[in-house]
């Protein structure tokens, strides 16, 4: 993210779900999923953000 968008930070909005906000079989209940966005919340970046996550091994 730093290399792609120098002034933008990665935001983790949720990693573990205790409140039941995700689908029943979500990996959030096992602590194996995260919800992420960018600090500027620009939805146009989400496709590239997903590609960067895959390249990083997620």
From Swiss-Prot:
Query: Domain comment?
Result: The desert hedgehog protein N-product binds calcium and zinc ions; this stabilizes the protein fold and is essential for protein-protein interactions mediated by this domain.
Provide the binding site for Zn(2+): 28, 35
Describe PTMs of this protein.
The C-terminal domain displays an autoproteolysis activity and a cholesterol transferase activity. Both activities result in the cleavage of the full-length protein and covalent attachment of a cholesterol moiety to the C-terminal of the newly generated N-terminal fragment (N-product). This covalent modification appears to play an essential role in restricting the spatial distribution of the protein activity to the cell surface. The N-product is the active species in both local and long-range signaling, whereas the C-product has no signaling activity.
Gene Ontology CC annotations of this record: extracellular space; plasma membrane
* PANTHER family (UniProt xref): HEDGEHOG, INDIAN HEDGEHOG PROTEIN
Protein's name according to its UniProt entry: Desert hedgehog protein
Q: Which family does it belong to?
A: Belongs to the hedgehog family.
Q: Which UniProt keywords apply?
A: Autocatalytic cleavage, Calcium, Cell membrane, Developmental protein, Hydrolase, Membrane, Metal-binding, Protease, Secreted, Zinc
Write out the function statement from the record. Answer: Intercellular signal essential for a variety of patterning events during development.
Question: Which regions form coiled coils?
Answer: none
Q: Can you list the disulfide-bonded cysteine pairs? A: none
Q: Which residues bind Ca(2+) 1?
A: 13-14
Q: Name one GO molecular function term.
A: patched binding
Record-listed Ca(2+) 2 binding positions: 14, 17, 19
Signal peptide as annotated in the record: none
| UniProt keyword annotation of Cell membrane present | yes
Q: Which SUPFAM superfamilies match?
A: Hedgehog/DD-peptidase
Protein's UniProt keywords contain Zinc: yes
Domain of life of the organism in this record? Eukaryota
Which Gene Ontology BP terms does the record give? cell fate specification; cell-cell signaling; proteolysis; regulation of gene expression; smoothened signaling pathway
Q: Which gene encodes it?
A: dhh
């Amino acid at each position: 993210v730093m290399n792609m968008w120098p002034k933008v930070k990665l935001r983790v909005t949720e990693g573990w779900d205790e409140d039941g906000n995700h689908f029943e079989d979500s990996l959030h209940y096992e602590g194996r999923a995260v919800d992420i966005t960018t600090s500027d919340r620009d939805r146009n970046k989400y496709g590239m953000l997903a590609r960067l996550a895959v390249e990083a091994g997620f």
